[in-house]
């Protein structure tokens, strides 16, 4: 029998303190107001008989005499095939006017997958984006963020990746979204044709911070079930992890916790790692590939959120000036697939293209400062223009093999075969015969 408590001793922000016994961290409770309305709350901490709870939806209209009932279980989300094509909020309730979701209730925020059952990833996730496929391959089960400067179209990039990969299921977790962002996700998933294999967990900017914290846990709990029980390859997209961290900061400040760097809680690294470590490829099972967006306030890479994220993840895509910056981006798992599941020329060609593009940036600086340009500088500048137009632009949408062929053509149009620094065996096989050496 559940005990009802009515001694709410303190209400501060979205937190309440109630005198109760037997509560557990993370336990779910219901609060019934005097007018009959009810809402959920979650136990954040307890001190003897004083239990502090975070109220979902805020404490507006709450009084000290309202009823608090502990449910004896943590937060859960409904899991099942009926989730596909649905949109839910931060507490797992449908927001798409399509009725209730039916299925099995599962716990969220469970421990990460047993490392013994993990396997070393060997498969490439194709995106048809040359700056990813050619230079920083996305590997199945990889955890990787998109570091985005302000004003960049990171949501459009996420949706494009979701539409063009071969994932069986796409799980999207949106945190701190404006109505415009939310509408964009809904419309683009329908327009690009993957809405039926997608489930969205959405926290809007006007919703309670605790719902923001729950969104990645719900998204990852469902993804893990799909991967383990149904052996599906799941792509999880989370945006924006900076909003997630800001929600953690707001909650910790309300709880009077001692702040760490720039006001964020000292547990920020662990809180981020707990979510990122859900990425996994399972032996004789499915996989979870995790791509997130981390916006950088004032384009500051040393901000605590991107700074901590870089120590956890397996690389990053740096989105700047509506391009994936090749110098700030990195995939630490690309060596597992380049030349093994891709063409033999992949690694050498990518290295040559990036090396020459780096040299072209120096030539651009010399031109801007008014120095006299050499013939080599002029070749580099011509190469740079072709490279940025035909490979770097996010408008380019081509398979990996075609991107590699274009890379060879760009080199042949700008340099002689002796100038590119690629071994003769590959030059003889892949150098375009139709392009005359200059």
From Swiss-Prot:
Pfam families: ATP-synt_ab, ATP-synt_ab_N, ATP-synt_VA_C
Gene3D superfamilies: 3.40.50.12240
Disulfide bonds listed in the record: none
GO biological process: proton motive force-driven plasma membrane ATP synthesis
Superkingdom of the source species: Bacteria
UniProt keyword Ion transport, yes or no: yes
GO molecular function: ATP binding; proton-transporting ATP synthase activity, rotational mechanism
Record keywords: ATP synthesis, Hydrogen ion transport, Ion transport, Transport
Family recorded in the similarity comment: Belongs to the ATPase alpha/beta chains family.
Protein role: Produces ATP from ADP in the presence of a proton gradient across the membrane. The V-type beta chain is a regulatory subunit.
Protein name (database record): V-type ATP synthase beta chain
Organism: Chlamydia pneumoniae
């Amino acid at each position: 029998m559940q005990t009802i408590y009515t001694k709410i001793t303190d209400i501060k922000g979205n937190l309440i303190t109630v005198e109760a016994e037997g509560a557990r961290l993370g336990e779910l409770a219901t609060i019934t107001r005097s007018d009959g309305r009810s809402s959920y709350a979650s136990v954040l901490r307890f001190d003897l008989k004083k239990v502090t709870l975070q109220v979902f939806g805020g404490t507006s209209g709450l009084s000290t005499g309202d009823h608090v009932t502990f449910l004896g279980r943590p937060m859960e989300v409904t899991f099942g095939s009926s989730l596909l094509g649905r949109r839910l909020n931060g507490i797992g309730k449908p927001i798409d006017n399509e009725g209730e979701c039916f299925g099995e209730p599962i716990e969220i925020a469970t421990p990460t997958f047993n490392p013994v059952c993990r396997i070393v990833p060997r498969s490439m996730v194709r995106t048809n984006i040359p700056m990813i496929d050619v230079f920083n391959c996305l590997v199945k089960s990889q955890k990787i963020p998109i570091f985005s400067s302000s004003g960049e179209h990171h949501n459009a990039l996420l949706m494009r990746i979701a539409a063009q990969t071969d994932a069986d299921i796409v799980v999207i977790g949106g945190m701190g979204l404006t109505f415009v962002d939310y509408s964009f996700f809904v419309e683009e998933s329908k327009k690009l044709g993957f809405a039926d294999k997608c489930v969205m967990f959405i926290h809007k900017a006007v919703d309670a911070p605790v719902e923001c914290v729950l969104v990645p846990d719900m998204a990852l709990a469902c993804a893990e079930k799909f991967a383990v029980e149904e052996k599906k390859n799941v792509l999880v997209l989370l945006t924006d992890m900076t909003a997630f961290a800001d929600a953690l900061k707001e909650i910790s400040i309300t709880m009077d916790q001692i702040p760490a760097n720039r006001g964020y809680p000292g547990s920020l690294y662990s809180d981020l790692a707990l979510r990122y470590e859900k990425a996994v490829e399972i032996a004789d099972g499915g996989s979870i590939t995790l791509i997130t967006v981390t916006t950088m306030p004032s384009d500051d890479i040393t901000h605590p959120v991107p700074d901590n994220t870089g120590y956890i993840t397996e690389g990053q895509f740096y989105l700047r000036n509506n391009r994936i910056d090749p110098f700030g981006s990195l995939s630490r798992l690309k060596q597992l697939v380049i030349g093994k599941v891709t063409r033999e020329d992949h690694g050498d060609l990518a290295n040559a293209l990036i090396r020459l593009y780096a040299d072209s940036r120096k030539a651009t600086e010399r031109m801007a400062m008014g120095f006299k340009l050499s013939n080599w500088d002029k070749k580099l500048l011509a190469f740079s223009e072709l490279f940025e137009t035909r490979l770097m632009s996010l408008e380019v949408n081509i398979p990996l093999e075609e991107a590699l062929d274009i890379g060879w053509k760009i080199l042949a149009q700008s340099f002689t075969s002796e100038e590119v620094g690629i071994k003769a065996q590959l030059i003889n096989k892949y150098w375009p015969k139709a392009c005359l050496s200059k």
